[in-house]
From Swiss-Prot:
CDD domains: PLPDE_III_ADC (cd06830). It catalyses: L-arginine + H(+) = agmatine + CO2. Keywords: Decarboxylase, Lyase, Magnesium, Metal-binding, Polyamine biosynthesis, Pyridoxal phosphate, Spermidine biosynthesis. The modification N6-(pyridoxal phosphate)lysine is found at K101. This is Biosynthetic arginine decarboxylase. NCBIfam families: PRK05354.1, speA. Its cofactor is Mg(2+); pyridoxal 5'-phosphate.
Length: 637
């Protein structure tokens, strides 16, 4: 690829669009991060950052967090709504509520809350969906009358804790998901002497499109039907507590790619709000829930991994619809709340790790088959000679298909005992040579060639064995086919010599990344610089800050990775603020009720029985170190 350039690299990996300006490729071909938007020229080279961490004793893989990205995401979303409110002369304000289920890590929650520390009136609250999350939120929420939204299924204890939150000075909205929860709230509030702030989750008829669309619509797991909502209103009237009903909540589903879906859902919910106001409810908060998407592939489309709108358009549509419908009903405009956790956290974290080895197809020269060889092999030789002699390009596809068919026949004949192992190996090499030659002759400009180019890219791709667990660090890539941008961290100033797929180190064939951002689309392989065992080859998995840590599992007992918090100072210096060690072998054994202390006793007994006395101390030390060691691979020498 003689026309390769840095611009070609940036376009090929589509960095400009999925990164939102936080990540880029330098003129030297290094992947960089610019976490502070106030100083876009202050960049950190991720390759050098990782090497510095390794020198400091932080083993790969390491999850790197950039808190300044969190700050920017919070403030940019609040700014978008503030501008929309001003544009449409909306008569209420906006509040951003962070649902901690997206990422409950202490550093993440604290940095989100700190992002508006300088504001006289912060526009931030927190959301909890379970008792453990509520306990965390009650302690971590900002002290001055902070808003807490309580979602999820509830028992009496959950409700009591939420009401205690009111006693502690918070504004706690208990969102009713089921009709039966109202009775519990009324009883517990009476016992505690606390007037509750109630919310309703409406089950809309409209259902957004996407992987999480089941969380919206009439068949959704959560929410109250129109009839159930009216029952709640009647029961509150009978209890003389209708003024406790202060919030309307709905949720269209996570990662809503199409802005028209958001607009339509908000329109339906706005009519719920106005109708409830006309029934006498004192609702003054309109909680649109989640749904604000993240453009994982950078295509700015309606695909499940993208979004066809920006922040301003998102805020404008919500504010515009609410303004129009409230004016139509002559009802006051409510405070707008959104629970946009994915948008806040996805970009801030990147997993950096190393390629520990590769496996590439070796295309070898072949000699013509022996005269007495089966006719099938002679046919394959003829296909190769026609191709290597540069046959008419119109015949390329035909030759390729013939070679594929011949290979399948050769494998079948071998299974029937009619072809020797050597003859099968020759057939496979002949097919490989044809594939390799055809790949170089096909043109992406020819639409008939494109499917075969994709097929050959996948067939001939190198296998990169990468030091991580897909199930621990990118569970959504395995579970729901989520796309995450993947990039080699250096060498991008040179044309990629290979295409590769990334395989993890678990003993599971599902441990493979099979979708990659490539230009304006998704491919099954990734263009990469050639791998060399002589120097570290680092890979970055981007946009893993939302859901991945808490959803990750311990398949093969690979545990949490090391992590670090990194920022850029005003003077441009890199600051590694904190490093947290990942799980040790003993840690993950403890998760499955296996005791490292018991293991050491067993090891000692076995060593005394089977190991010579002069070796015992060394062997026991190795076993002890193994239990204290990182669960990922560290020693390749």
């Amino acid at each position: 690829m003689n026309d390769w350039s840095i611009e070609a690299a940036r376009a090929g990996y589509n960095v400009t669009h999925w990164s939102q300006g936080f990540y880029g490729i330098s003129d030297e071909g290094e992947v960089t991060v610019s976490p502070d938007p106030k100083n876009p020229d202050h960049k950190i080279g991720l390759n050098e950052l990782a090497k510095d961490m390794v020198k400091a004793g932080v083993a790969l893989p390491v999850l790197v967090r950039f808190p300044q990205i969190l700050h920017h995401r919070v403030n940019s979303l609040c700014q978008a709504f503030d501008q929309a409110i001003q544009k449409y002369e909306y008569q209420a304000d906006y509040l951003l509520v962070y649902p901690i289920k997206v990422n409950q890590q202490k550093t993440v929650v604290e940095e989100i809350l700190a992002s508006q520390a300088s504001k006289e009136v912060p526009q931030l609250g927190l959301e909890a969906g379970s008792k453990p999350e509520l306990m965390a939120v009650l302690a971590m929420a900002q002290k001055a009358s902070s808003v807490i939204v309580c979602n999820g299924y509830k028992d009496n204890e959950y409700i009591r804790l939420a009401l205690i939150g009111e006693k502690l000075g918070h504004k706690v909205y208990i969102v009713l998901e089921k009709l039966s929860e109202l009775k519990m709230v009324l009883a517990e509030s009476k016992r505690l002497g606390v007037k509750p702030r109630l919310g309703l989750r409406a089950r809309l008829a409209f259902q957004g499109k996407g992987k999480w669309q089941a969380s919206g619509g009439e068949k959704s797991k959560f929410g109250l039907s129109a009839a159930q909502i009216l029952t709640v209103v009647d029961q509150l009237k009978q209890s003389d507590m209708l003024d406790s009903l202060q919030l309307l909540h709905f949720h269209l589903g996570s990662q809503i790619a199409n802005i028209r879906d958001i607009r339509q859902g908000v329109s339906e919910a706005a009519r719920f709000y106005c109708e409830l106001r006309e029934l006498g409810a004192s609702i003054n908060c309109f909680d649109v829930g989640g749904g604000l998407a993240v453009d994982y592939d950078g295509t700015r489309s309606q695909s499940n991994n993208s979004m066809n709108y920006g922040l301003s358009e998102y805020a404008n549509n919500i504010v515009n619809v609410l303004t129009d419908i409230c004016n139509e009903y002559e009802q006051p405009m409510p405070r707008i709340i959104s629970e946009s956790g994915r948008h806040l956290t996805a970009h801030h974290a990147v997993l950096i790790t190393d390629v520990i080895g590769t496996e590439a197809y070796q295309v070898e020269d072949i000699q013509p088959p022996e005269e007495e060889s089966p006719q099938l092999l002679h046919n394959m030789w003829q296909s190769w000679t026609e191709l290597s002699g540069r046959a008419d390009q119109r015949a390329l596809i035909e030759i390729y298909h013939d070679s594929q068919s011949d290979l399948q026949e050769a494998q079948s004949l071998f299974a029937l005992g009619q072809l020797s192992l050597a003859e099968r190996a020759w057939a496979e090499q002949a097919n490989l040579r044809v594939c390799h030659e055809v790949q170089g002759l096909l043109s992406t400009k020819n639409r008939y060639h494109r499917p075969i180019i994709d097929e050959l890219n996948e067939k001939l791709a190198d296998k990169f064995f990468v030091n991580f667990s897909l199930f621990q660090s990118l569970p959504d890539a395995w579970g729901i086919d989520q796309v995450f941008p993947v990039l080699p961290l250096s060498g991008l100033d040179k044309a990629p010599e290979r295409r590769a797929v990334m395989l993890d180190i678990t003993c599971d064939s599902d441990g493979i990344v099979d979708q990659y951002v490539d230009g304006q689309g998704i491919e099954t392989t990734l263009p990469v610089p050639a791998w060399s065992a002589e120097s570290p080859y680092l890979i970055g998995f981007f946009m893993v800050g939302a859901y991945q840590e808490i959803l990750g599992d311990m398949h093969n007992l690979f545990g949490d990775t090391n992590s670090a918090v990194v920022s850029i100072e005003e003077n441009g210096m890199t600051n590694i603020e904190s490093v947290l060690a990942g799980d040790t072998v003993a840690d993950v054994l403890r998760y499955v009720n296996l005791d490292a202390v018991d293991f050491m006793r067993t090891y000692e007994e076995l060593v005394n029985q089977h190991i010579a006395e002069d070796e015992r101390a060394q062997i026991l030390e190795e076993l002890q170190v193994g239990l204290k060691g990182y669960t990922y691979l560290e020693d390749f020498s």
